[in-house]
Amino acid sequence: MPTTSGHTTAIRASRVIGTEVKDNGGNVIGKVEDLILDKTDNAIMFAVVGFGGVLGMGEKFHPVPWSTLDFDPEFNAYVIPLSKEQLEAAPADSIKDLTKNDGSGIRDKAYDYYKAEPYWH
């Protein structure tokens, strides 16, 4: 089923992972490293956006609510309505620790930071 922007609503995770994330001006601020799924609510809990670091060292991983990312075919990237500095100030953790305690602690912080509507009940 097409969305209002003409895209279908179904997308493979393998197409999302590795896609660049840009700010509204088209500047690259990171890329989607992973998707965290919520098996209880059958939803994407958040996309993991990584940036910073050199050769994999010092990279920060930010849980970004899926609803916050918007794919822009002109940029061939997901666009987030934040600057790199705002993303740097967002909640972050090691990629392994993002799922600690079922991910709910960092999930709540991320949804608050991005002012995203919670999907869970």
Predicted regions and their residues:
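Peripheral interaction segments used for macromolecular assembly
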Residues: 1-121
